Structure formats: C-alpha cells, structure tokens
Amino acid sequence: MSSNTAAPGADITHPQARRAIISSSIGNALEWFDILIYGAFAVVIAKQFFPTGDDSVSLLLTFATFGVSFFMRPLGAVVLGAYSDRAGRKAALMLSIMLMTVGTAMIAFMPSYASIGLLAPAGIALGKMIQGFSAGGEFGSSTAFLVEHAPHRRGFFSSWQVASQGISLLLAALFGAVLNNMLTPEQLASWGWRVPFIFGLLIAPAGIYIRRHLDEAPEFKESSEKTNAPLRDTFVHQKMRLLIGAGSVIMATVSVYLSLYIPTYAVKQLGLPAWSSFAAMSVAGLIMFIGSPLVGALSDKIGRTPFMITSSALYIVLTYPMFVFLTNSPGFLQLLLLQTVIGVLMTMYFAAMPALLADIFPVATRGTGMSLAYNIAVTIFGGFAGLIITWLIDFTGDKLSVSYFVIFGAVLSLIASLSARLVLRLR
C-alpha cells in the first residue's frame, strides 16, 4: 500500500467538499473543546468537585477522572468504529455527536460537591465517560468520511480535523484568558467555569443538523471491500498496521496535551498568572488552525512521513532546553515562545498524521482500524498525561519532569513513522 495510491473515482465538487469538511470538523472541534476546557479549568474544577484539603491531591483526582474517561475511548472505538464500517460513516457521526452533547450537558450543569456531595464527582465522572465513549469513535469515523470524499487529496481534507482542533485550542485559551481576567476567583469558581461548557452545547445542535443532511462518503459507497467483522479482521490481519498506527498517534497526542497542560504547569509550578498562560496557549491554537491545511496539502505532494519524522526529531532535541529556559526565566514572553515552538512542531506532525492513518488501513476496516489506533495511543499518552506529569513533579521535585514525558513519546513516534515508511512503504 502506498500513500499516494487512491481509490478510483474523481474528487468531489466544492460545495460537497465544504459540507464534508464542516460536518466532520464541527464534531471533532466540539469533542476537543470540551477536553481542553476541562483541562484548562482543572484547578477550579478540582476545588468544586474534589475538595480534599490538599490542592495537589484535588488536582490529581481531577486529572484521574479525566484519565478514567479515556478508558471508554477504546470501547467507543470498537463499537462506533465497527458501526461506521458496517452501517456507514454518516450513521456513526450522528451517534457520536449526540452522545458528546449528553456528556457535555452533564458537566455544564452538574451541582458542586458542596450541594450534592459524592453525587457531584460521580456525575462528572459519568459525563466524562460518555464523552470518552463518543470521542472513541469520532476521530476514526470523521477522518474516514473526509478522506473518502477526496481520495486524491487525503492530506488536505483530513488536515481539517487538526485545524478544527486548533480552533478548539484557540477558543479554550481565549475563554480561559478572558474569564480569568474579568471574573473574581469566587465568580470563576461559582459559575464562570461553566460558561465555556454551555457555549459548547450551543454548537452541538448545528453539528447534528448538518450531519443529518449529509450524503454518505463516495469511496465507502462504491467500495467492494466490505466485511461483517471489521474488528476481527483488524486484529487478525492488520496487527502490524495497528501497532504502527497507534505509535504514529503518540506524538500528536503528547503535543496537544502538552499544550493543554502548560497553563496548569505555569500557574502551579512557575507562579505565573492564569490569563498569561491561556493567552500564550491561544498562539499554539492559531498556528494549528492556519498551518494544518498547508501541511496537509504539502503532504499530498511530498508525503506524510517527512513532516512527522522531522517534527519528532526536533521534539527530542528541543524539549528539554525549552523547559530549562522557561523554568529558569519564567515570564509571559518565555511562555509565549514555548507555545509558539510547540504550535509549529505540533502542526507539522499532527496535520500529516490523519492521512497516514487513512493510508495504513483499507476501506473495509478503516473506521475500526483508525479508531483503535488513535484511541489506544490517546488513552495511554493523553488521558493520563496530566496525572502522570503532576505525579512525576510531586514525586521527584523536578519541574523538568514534563520534558522527559514528551521526549519519550517523541522517540516512540519517530520509530513508528520510520516503520510506516520502511516497513509499510508509505511515504
């Protein structure tokens, strides 16, 4: 299989392209907006739902709940990914966005621990688990839907998944900066943190409406590669592809969650004001939004792996010095520089990755294969990233522990990207 081997058939018209991009991206954007907002307001949520008398323990419990929701992702990947391979991409996309909306509503309106006791953290955990199940099938189904609309421009079309995450990162950062700057700590704790979740709920009906009026992906409809057991076929016949796919997702996951964790790191470890950390994070989101379609389009011409290999190598070389620089000279400009570098490297890697995943798996098992590969990596290296980093810093007393986690992920993804190029002959 080669990355420049496309299915027969012409690419779709511009109106169809716009509908496909918007419908796929809006659900992905909602998913990531909720994830990013939860992480961005972790310090506030910890005090409202996990009061222990120890801020570090409360924060650990908040991130643990965040991580537990990711255990639902592989289950969602299996159920919704296989559903998309049997019933179609459109049906799976409809189901995933409706489930995401339910989970978001539960978090947005959940009373605090002071109001209903243990039901409050239990309700937050349940809402996050529903979101995790939904997110487990969202990426694979929506990315498959995009690439199957334009087999000759997979890189460009699938990169809009990443651009939509850039919008989510930008919006989450702006909400964080504005709310922290305009509200008192008491107002933020009482009701301010709920505002972005309610905003996310306002987006959901538009996404549901758009997806309901979609046509099925042309390549999926025309394909003769159909299977009644996509999960079995993926595990039996595509184990190496699944392993390489999961490995290739690691650096993308670590990059996003690194950018997400930095506001907490800046406030808790460096003592910087919350608004400055969110303002710096918005730069990474802006770079991701603007740069992703450019990288995706270039990957259609020169291949996916050159971007991914280069980005992984630069992460390995630059991460430790960047955090030494920030830790020794904490300040807004230093934080801004760090987020800018992360934004560039994250975009280089992440924007090329969805098309590579689509190249790895055939049409018949693409929804299942992509969902599993993506969510195995995201569960391990994303869901527990904040928990692992917070614990490492508390356990070792070394503020640079975050850089070791990033470098480890970069090494694994470099190996996976090289394997995709050398073993699977993908470019």
Residues covered by each model-derived region:
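Cytoplasmic membrane-interface "Motif A"-like loop-to-helix N-cap segments
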Residues: 86-97, 301-312
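Extracytoplasmic gate region of multi-pass secondary transporters
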Residues: 39, 239-288, 382-386
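C-terminal ends and interior cores of transmembrane alpha-helices
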Residues: 98-116, 313-329
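C-terminal transmembrane helical hairpin of 12-TM major facilitator-type secondary transporters
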Residues: 305-352
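Glycine-rich segments within core transmembrane alpha-helices of 12-TM secondary carriers
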Residues: 134, 156-177, 374-385
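Extracellular/periplasmic helix-loop-helix junction of adjacent transmembrane segments
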Residues: 42-75
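Multi-pass alpha-helical transporter architecture, strongest
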Residues: 207-214, 408-427
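Hydrophobic core of transmembrane alpha-helices in multi-pass small-molecule transporters
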Residues: 116-136, 332-348
